[in-house]
Swiss-Prot record:
It is a multi-pass membrane protein. This is L-carnitine/gamma-butyrobetaine antiporter. The gene is caiT. Belongs to the BCCT transporter (TC 2.A.15) family. CaiT subfamily. The chain crosses the membrane at residues 10-30, 51-71, 92-112, 143-163, 195-215, 231-251, 263-283, 316-336, 347-367, 398-418, 446-466, 475-495. Catalyzes the exchange of L-carnitine for gamma-butyrobetaine. Keywords: Antiport, Cell inner membrane, Cell membrane, Membrane, Transmembrane, Transmembrane helix, Transport. It comes from Escherichia coli O8 (strain IAI1). GO terms for cellular component: plasma membrane. Pathway: Amine and polyamine metabolism; carnitine metabolism. PANTHER family: HIGH-AFFINITY CHOLINE TRANSPORT PROTEIN-RELATED (PTHR30047), L-CARNITINE_GAMMA-BUTYROBETAINE ANTIPORTER (PTHR30047:SF11). It is found in: Cell inner membrane. Homotrimer.
Length: 504
């Protein structure tokens, strides 16, 4: 029994360092919020202005890697000897489900406002040119390019899972071909895993920080309960308790059902917005935006704005590339696990086509609706943000639709379910990554899962206390820096091992 407890207990070298680091950072932040905001602005400015180019080149190089996989020597290689575990339709639906988080609903509803009010390329704010480019930039940030980078890493993890039969719960496990078993299991591997975990904790905390205000603003709109930081903290606490109950009572099946409900409700809500907002305009705007994307793509790929220094690529493109980098390993592991039995080419094409369609539908429908409301002067987003915050502005874009009460109820349920599944996924991923020899299909210890969900909740509350989007953007960018190198090492390790062991 003692040996069994040791096996399923925490792994101290990857459990305590992230816990201590994140705990200290949260404590320092809460001690002096004003000083923390000064540091946040300095970190954001340094990383985006000094190293933003590196994130842009990373995405471009990974795009070339995608073409190499699709048309290169491994294109027809199968990821495992078994037939595909899921039908193509189910596989693509699962991909779509992974895109419908509350954070995605947050950005999809408000992102276009920022693009047209502070546009790139020296365009006049709120001008025709800015509006023509607004959705095109969303399609760029959430389109084929980032999904192509995920394709490469998904192939890498699927190769390690199903071809090499490796148990991978932390990125260091994949680095044996690159640095050797001694270093991968030694200090170097421990450092890599700690970088990954700290970054992942902050990423999940930021997602919670984006999702929670949407739920509390819905509560204010529906029930008249004032939106305060205390209410945010209460809601986050309720999610943590609900997650603990689900785990303790073996209700994981219920969580999976909730995830399916979230996906179907997402389709329903998007369909509703598409129909009542203006289907003809949405399709015309999308078509025009694809053309604008193709026209400006080379400039977008390499846009750093070093002369005019308007800040658009730093505030948005670099931020989003860091967002994609920081979630790459977690997301790619999930996508790899549902892709057993598929060929490399099939996985690459399926991800780029299926996931791009998912994100493009979300951003096109929600962004077009927001633009229509702005153009018709139905809502005043700048005033809403200044007086009440970004979350209220997002809620008003939904409340402006017909049958507003029913619409807000649907949005409220969607955000609530999305965040419940987010907290559950957060606690599971972090617990799996910080426990000793918990294999796929087994459950990590209950207290470890609850502990991590509490810490992620604390980070969400701290980011909300700081106020505004800049702390959230900075947390993502700071976390993305170390994972930038981790992702590259995983990629190189796959290439090296495949060259030696994946021959005809």
């Amino acid at each position: 029994m003692k040996n069994e407890k040791r096996k399923t207990g925490i792994e101290p070298k990857v459990f305590f360092p992230p816990l201590i680091i994140v705990g200290i950072l949260c404590w320092l932040t809460v001690r002096d919020l004003d000083a923390a905001n000064v540091v946040i602005n300095a970190v954001f400015s340094y990383v985006t202005n000094v190293w933003g180019w590196a994130f842009e080149w990373y995405m471009v190089v990974m795009l070339f890697g995608w073409f190499w996989l699709v048309f290169g020597p491994y294109a027809k290689k199968r990821l495992g000897n078994e037939p595909p575990e899921f039908s193509t339709a189910s596989w693509i639906f699962m991909m779509f489900a992974s895109c419908t988080s509350a954070a995605v609903l947050f950005w999809g509803s408000i992102e276009i406002y920022y693009y047209i009010s502070t546009p790139p390329f020296g365009l006049e704010p709120n001008s025709t040119g800015a509006k023509e480019l607004g959705l095109a930039y969303s399609l760029f940030h959430w389109g084929p390019l980032p999904w192509a980078t995920y394709s490469f890493l998904s192939v890498a993890f699927a190769y390690f899972f199903f071809v090499r039969k490796m148990e991978v719960i932390r990125p260091s496990s994949t680095l044996v071909p690159l640095v050797g078993e001694k270093h991968a299991k030694g200090l170097f591997g421990t450092i890599v895993d700690n970088f990954y975990l700290v970054a992942l904790i902050f990423a999940m905390g930021t997602s919670l920080g984006l999702a929670t205000p949407l739920v509390t603003e819905c509560m204010q709109w529906l029930f008249g309960i004032p939106h305060t930081l205390q209410l945010d903290a209460i809601i986050i606490t309720c999610w943590i308790i609900l997650n603990a109950i689900c785990v303790a009572c073996g209700l994981q099946k219920g969580v999976r059902i909730a995830s399916d409900v979230r996906s179907y409700l997402s389709f329903l809500m998007l369909g509703w917005v598409f129909i009542v907002s203006g289907a003809s305009f949405i399709m015309n705007y999308f078509t025009d935006s694809v053309g604008m994307l193709l026209m400006y793509l080379p400039r977008m790929l390499f846009y750093t704005d070093p002369i005019a220094k308007g800040g658009f690529p730093q505030g948005w493109t670099v931020f989003y590339w860091a967002w994609w980098v920081i979630y790459a390993i977690q997301m790619s592991i999930f996508l790899a696990r549902i892709s057993r039995g598929r060929t490399v080419r099939e996985l690459c094409f399926g991800m780029v086509l299926g996931l791009t369609a998912s994100t493009w539908i979300l951003w096109t429908v929600l962004g077009s609706n927001t633009l229509l409301l702005i153009d018709k002067n139905i809502i005043n987003i700048p005033n809403l943000i200044e007086q009440y915050g970004v979350a209220r502005a997002i809620i008003e874009t939904w409340a402006a639709l017909p049958l507003s009460t029913a619409t807000i109820w649907g949005f409220f349920i969607l955000c609530f379910i999305a965040t419940v599944t987010l907290v559950n996924a957060c606690s599971y991923t972090l617990a799996m990554s910080t426990c000793r020899e918990v294999r796929d299909g087994e459950e990590p210890p209950l207290l470890v899962r609850i502990g991590w969900s509490i810490l992620v909740g604390i980070i969400g509350i701290v980011l909300l206390a700081l106020g505004g989007l800049k702390p959230i953007q900075t947390a993502i960018i700071a976390g993305g820096c170390p994972l930038f190198f981790v992702n590259i090492m995983v990629t190189l390790s796959f290439i090296k091992d495949a060259k030696q062991n994946w021959k005809d």
